[in-house]
């Protein structure tokens, strides 16, 4: 029996030394992912917006109202600049003369920015041609939003009715 205990003890001691002296073996797997540059985009309300109303008059006047939130999103990355522009068609009634786009002005108002963009509003007083309304410079992914006020000069003696125009935003 003593011999069995001695042999058993030797086996246990050998096994303990083997475990203590062994090195663990592992397998490391590198993992990566890719972020690709996105686009420069602009969004604006697509539903019709009422700028307000007033009584037709022998005196000229101005109608002003909020257009709704406009947002430029720049997902190009890096150091980039952009220019947001706007153009308007004439405000045309169902009957009678149109109120020309030269009577339409645009004020961007306060600009809310995210991350690393600096955006500056530029007053536009005549929307017959493409007019710059906000410029931006960023480092990285960014966005800028504003809620512009559209003002329309209404000449004296314009006929009562609903006047409609299309205001188009673009960014480059």
Where are these regions (language model features)?
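Signature of Gram-negative chaperone-usher
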Residues: 6, 21-172
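Secretory targeting and sorting signals
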Residues: 2-24
């Amino acid at each position: 029996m003593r011999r069995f205990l001695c042999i058993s003890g030797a086996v246990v001691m050998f096994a303990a030394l083997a475990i203590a002296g062994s090195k663990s073996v592992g397998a490391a797997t590198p993992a990566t992912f890719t972020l690709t540059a996105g686009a420069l985009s602009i969004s604006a309300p697509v539903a019709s917006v009422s700028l307000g109303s007033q009584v037709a008059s022998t005196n000229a006047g101005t109608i002003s109202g909020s257009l709704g939130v406009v947002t430029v999103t720049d997902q190009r990355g890096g150091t980039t600049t952009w220019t947001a522009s706007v153009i308007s068609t004439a405000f045309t009634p169902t009957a009678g003369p149109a109120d020309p786009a030269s009577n339409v002005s645009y004020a961007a108002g306060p600009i809310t920015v995210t991350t690393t963009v600096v955006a500056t509003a530029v007053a536009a007083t005549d929307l017959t041609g493409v007019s710059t309304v906000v410029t931006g410079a960023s480092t990285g992914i960014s966005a800028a939003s504003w809620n512009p006020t559209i003002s329309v000069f209404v000449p004296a003696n314009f006929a009562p009715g609903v006047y409609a125009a299309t205001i188009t935003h673009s960014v480059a």
